[in-house]
């Protein structure tokens, strides 16, 4: 996990990707990878979540370019710090 997670609403382009994604959540797992926790979940931009199978999961290390950084205030900063602590605890358990 990268030390500085991006705020919700950030728009990114992934390595080997041609479609922009907007970040909509953090610390998610999938049925396909139940033992892996991804840094982010998101959906295609500008389409949004069209169907549940259009949700993407990815890690910060997969981001090639940050196109737009989402809104960040003190509340979000505290939340991101908490998420980083949770991810460290999860990694220590595995």
Question: Each predicted region: which residue ranges?
Answer:
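Short beta-strand-centered aromatic/proline hotspots
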Residues: 19-29
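Short, solvent-exposed secondary-structure boundary/capping segments
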Residues: 29-38
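Short, well-ordered loop/turn sites that connect or cap secondary structure elements
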Residues: 3-6
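A generic structural signal for short beta-strands and their flanking turns/coil linkers
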Residues: 19, 39-41
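Intrinsically disordered, low-complexity, charged/polar segments
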Residues: 41-94
């Amino acid at each position: 996990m990268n030390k500085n997670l991006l705020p919700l609403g950030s728009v990114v382009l992934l390595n080997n990707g041609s479609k922009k994604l907007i970040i909509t959540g953090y610390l998610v797992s999938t049925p396909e990878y139940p033992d892996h926790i991804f840094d982010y979940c998101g959906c295609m931009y500008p389409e949004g979540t069209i169907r549940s199978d259009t949700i993407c999961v990815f890690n910060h290390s997969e981001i090639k370019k940050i196109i737009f950084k989402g809104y960040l205030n003190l509340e979000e900063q505290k939340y991101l710090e908490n998420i980083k602590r949770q991810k460290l605890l999860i990694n220590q358990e595995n």
